[in-house]
Design a protein with these regions (language model features):
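Conserved C-terminal alpha-helix-loop-beta "cap" of PLP-dependent enzymes
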Residues: 146, 159-180
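Conserved glycine-rich beta-strand-loop-beta hairpin in the small C-terminal domain of fold type I
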Residues: 111, 127-136, 147-160, 166
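Helix C-cap/helix->beta junction micro-motif
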Residues: 31-32, 142, 177
């Protein structure tokens, strides 16, 4: 079957899609019998009660998530999938085939994080929104820099108006400054 692959929230767009847009994607997928694969690893940090998952609006959604981004725990290497029964069983079979075990430490850390998720998200919200304000203040002073400010998420897309292609700029930055 066909698959429509979409990240929610989009790291490039720095925004979440609203229920209307999710519904439109679901209708397109439904019209061609496609699954919609969504990585929802960047859950919103504000208006969380209004957030809708693709799994809320489409019966053939496959939604992935993890503790890595919103919960700031990439070391746990723990994630999850929401799908229909057939999809869940296929994914579980593949996971069992490719992974011997998840690790007791990983499970314990994941349990702790989820038990304290509200405190963790509140801490992250303060950091992200504080950094967003700092970035906005700096961008406001730069005539060759613009961005799509993040809307409730921790990622954004910064654009440079420079007379150089991206690859050349990155190579020069690495060569001259030792950073990439």
């Amino acid at each position: 079957p066909a698959v429509i692959d979409k990240d929610f929230a989009s790291a490039k767009l720095a925004e979440l899609l609203d229920a209307d847009m999710l519904g439109q994607i679901a209708e397109i997928a439904r019209s061609v019998g496609a699954y919609v694969l969504c990585d929802e690893v960047y859950l919103p940090l504000e208006n969380t009660e209004a957030f809708m998952s693709m799994a809320d609006v489409y019966e053939n959604a496959i939604v992935t998530n993890s503790l890595s981004k919103t919960y700031s725990t990439p070391a746990a290497r723990v994630g999850w999938v929401v799908a229909d029964e057939e999809g869940s069983n296929r994914i579980r079979t593949y996971r069992d085939y490719t992974m011997i075990c998840g690790g007791v430490f990983n499970d314990a850390l994941a349990t702790y994080v989820l038990e304290h998720k509200d405190k963790i998200v509140e801490r992250n919200r303060k950091i992200v929104f504080g950094n967003r304000d700092i970035a906005q203040a700096w961008i406001d002073t730069q005539h060759r820099v613009s961005w799509t400010a993040p809307q409730g998420v921790s990622t954004s897309f910064i654009q440079l108006d420079i007379p150089e292609d991206d690859e050349g700029f990155c190579k020069r930055l690495l060569s001259e400054r030792g950073v990439l």
